[in-house]
Amino acid sequence: MVRMEDIISLAKRKGFVFQSSEVYGGLSGAWDYGPLGVELKKNIKSEWWKSMVYLHENIVGLDSAIFMRPEIWRASGHIDGFSDSMVDCKDCKSRFRADFIDLSKNCPNCKVGNNFTSPRSFNLMFKTHIGVVEDSSSEIYLRPETAQGIFVNFRNVLDSSRLKIPFGIAQVGKAFRNEIVTKNFIFRTCEFEQMEMQFFVHPKQIDEWFCYWQQNRMNFFIETLKIRPDKLRFKAHDSTQLAHYAKSAFDIEYEFPFGFQEVEGIHNRGNYDLTQHSKFSNNPKIFEYHDLLTKERYVPHVIETSAGLTRSVLMTLCNAYSEEELSDGDKRIVLRLHPKLAPYKIAIFPLVKKVELVEIARRIYIELCDDFHIFYDDSGTIGKRYRRQDEIGTPYCVTVDYSTIEDETVTVRERNNMTQKRIFINDLYSYIKTEILNYKEDFNK
């Protein structure tokens, strides 16, 4: 069983995630992504973008501003309705989301009897000011979701891209929520990244497309990110759990070390958002769709897929982490990342730091670095270098040895099963490409 302390230790030690502002004592719930973290995050984002935009001819991309006019958040219902209920323990002063604890039992922190304040509403949006004068006219918000930037650009995208219903708009970007409690490492934070797609459909086709996107998104986690199927599940929202904009919703949950938690939501938003913006902007035609074939005019309904990029990073680390007992009694830590997600695809080693071996290793690096992100390492024993790459998920290690000088072959060592093959240098590119393309994960290991 994977433990969170092992994931956190690896993430910090190897440069996936660092505590933000650490030299000043750190900032609770804020994290910086290190050299390996930014690569893993970029690779997940790239696979998501490919699955949404490149593999669907009727989905296009958008990158909307973080700052938007406050009227947008008034129309969307976030100013009045985007809040959580919170309570405080009167004894230890700890603060909790009311829906995260049993108020009839002892405080989870101090274990004293149920001595809580009455639940009170807490708006999750960060408010700030824009301009030189701080008054009500200059109030502005950090966006709590990326979706509204898509909705207010509905007409711009529709007209400029010459799209027809059904179509989607995809976006990856940062969102901000003043969470009552930040916890579980990078899982719940005030600053995070979302991967969202809003799919606009005819009202009569909403159920059909909702089912399609449910299955499509589950397949993405299993087939593309190679998440263990037994660690994933659907969870339906009941009426008390629905967001103010949703008619129905399903979460895709992953079994983290701290239990099953949401990594993506699929929501039937109906025509709530477009209708609200048509009312508040006094411009209903902008949010209306005119079908030239049927002559029908209507406000499209929306299916939303909303995944947490930062949560997906944590899920991927938990899913890939393993510890193995070797035949010599030693322990090996391995990140079994899909090669497409691995921060480095290849590590290149000269067996020893001799000029003739280093020159060949450097030549291979230069020949392949346009196509693969490569780590070069010539220090330490070859065994230790292998172990270092296993820990960060590098799928293939290429070793240049004395035989290379004679026959232009190198040793390619595979991460998961540690098998080694001799490959001609001229065949390295095609060999690695084929291996990545045909990669299969054995979920029984």
From Swiss-Prot:
One of its GO terms (molecular function) is glycine-tRNA ligase activity. Homodimer. It catalyses: tRNA(Gly) + glycine + ATP = glycyl-tRNA(Gly) + AMP + diphosphate. GO terms for biological process: glycyl-tRNA aminoacylation. HAMAP family: Gly_tRNA_synth_B. GO terms for cellular component: cytoplasm. InterPro entries: aa-tRNA-synt_IIb, aa-tRNA-synth_II, aa-tRNA-synth_II/BPL/LPL, Anticodon-bd, Anticodon-bd_dom_sf, Gly-tRNA_synthase/POLG2, Gly_tRNA_ligase_bac, GlyRS-like_core. This is Glycine--tRNA ligase. Its EC number is 6.1.1.14. Belongs to the class-II aminoacyl-tRNA synthetase family. ATP binds at residues 177-179, 187-192, 262-263, 308-311. Pfam families: HGTP_anticodon, tRNA-synt_2b. Substrate binds at R97, E145, F192, E193, Q194, M195, E196, E304, T305, S306, A307, G308. Catalyzes the attachment of glycine to tRNA(Gly). Keywords: Aminoacyl-tRNA synthetase, ATP-binding, Cytoplasm, Ligase, Nucleotide-binding, Protein biosynthesis. PROSITE patterns: AA_TRNA_LIGASE_II. It is found in: Cytoplasm.
